[in-house]
Amino acid sequence: MPEQREKRKKEESDVVRAEGVVEEALPNTTFRVKLDSGHDILAYISGKMRIHYIRILPGDRVVLEISPYDTSRGRIVYRK
């Protein structure tokens, strides 16, 4: 009988958190975000933010989770 592998959730250490300002709203709930470090990132809204109808407008400060594998895209997880 083969051993069962444990399913692992994405750990917090797998993502990088960053803050930025929404510059532009694009189609399909995608946004262009300017990070505090000066980089531009394409970001989408996380599932919980969609469920709770949290609106994001240009000029809002947001917190992003960025994957270390593709640093040009991210997920918006919090609006300040």
Swiss-Prot record:
Residues 6-80 form the S1-like domain. One of its GO terms (molecular function) is translation initiation factor activity. Disulfide bonds: none annotated. Pfam families: eIF-1a. One of its GO terms (cellular component) is cytosol. PROSITE patterns: S1_IF1_TYPE. Its main location: cytoplasm. InterPro entries: NA-bd_OB-fold, RNA-binding_domain_S1_IF1, TIF_IF1. It is found in: Cytoplasm. It comes from the Bacteria. Keywords: Cytoplasm, Initiation factor, Protein biosynthesis, RNA-binding, rRNA-binding. Transmembrane segments: none annotated. PANTHER family: TRANSLATION INITIATION FACTOR IF-1, CHLOROPLASTIC. One of the essential components for the initiation of protein synthesis. Stabilizes the binding of IF-2 and IF-3 on the 30S subunit to which N-formylmethionyl-tRNA(fMet) subsequently binds. Helps modulate mRNA selection, yielding the 30S pre-initiation complex (PIC). Upon addition of the 50S ribosomal subunit IF-1, IF-2 and IF-3 are released leaving the mature 70S translation initiation complex. Component of the 30S ribosomal translation pre-initiation complex which assembles on the 30S ribosome in the order IF-2 and IF-3, IF-1 and N-formylmethionyl-tRNA(fMet); mRNA recruitment can occur at any time during PIC assembly. Belongs to the IF-1 family. This is Translation initiation factor IF-1.
